């Protein structure tokens, strides 16, 4: 590659005694696996730099599946994440690692991710930012569901009616109830990415769970386990 690339480290793991293997999301090259040689040495100038949620300029070499880092510098300080918000940000990273193929550019998704992190850093409630990012991710993965029109008739969604979701096809008017049933009001809120009530947020979360399941597979997300203690404490 030529020049510096805007990146975020999504995840890292030790490699040998002195190095790190990085899962990186880059603006123009998508997700990459990059070896950072010597990053774990005590005197490494990269110590503390290759962290999630820190905007970075990076440069690397290599044409295979594993690149080699040649330069990294912070663009700015890490976006501030604490507690429940931090767990939410780790969730975004884990989803990207799970669903994105290596070396596939997603420049618009990169900006969606950056905007989601900025929104999380200022949020009291992370749920709206998470739902908006999940919906953006589904769009970039080619999951083109129309929330504004009935899949059966093509008629506009009526906010007073009920609709049943057929996976990969869309929503049809229905009197059914259950996990795959949504009100027109909920669908219009999802379409607008505007969640003004808890009911609309819960519906958006239910939909994104359904839609992302084929991409995430059956293995549980580790970041979701971090939410369990907080949920239990709320109930006490």
UniProtKB/Swiss-Prot annotation:
Pfam family, one: RecO_C
Source species, domain of life: Bacteria
Record carries keyword rRNA processing: no
UniProt keyword terms in alphabetical order: DNA damage, DNA recombination, DNA repair
InterPro entries on file: ARFGAP/RecO, DNA_rep/recomb_RecO_N, NA-bd_OB-fold, RecO, RecO_C
A single GO BP: DNA recombination
Zinc-finger keyword on record: no
GO cellular-component term (any): bacterial nucleoid
Function: Involved in DNA repair and RecF pathway recombination.
Similarity annotation: Belongs to the RecO family.
Protein name: DNA repair protein RecO
The species this protein was found in: Photobacterium profundum (strain SS9)
Native organism taxonomy: Bacteria, Pseudomonadati, Pseudomonadota, Gammaproteobacteria, Vibrionales
Gene name as annotated: recO
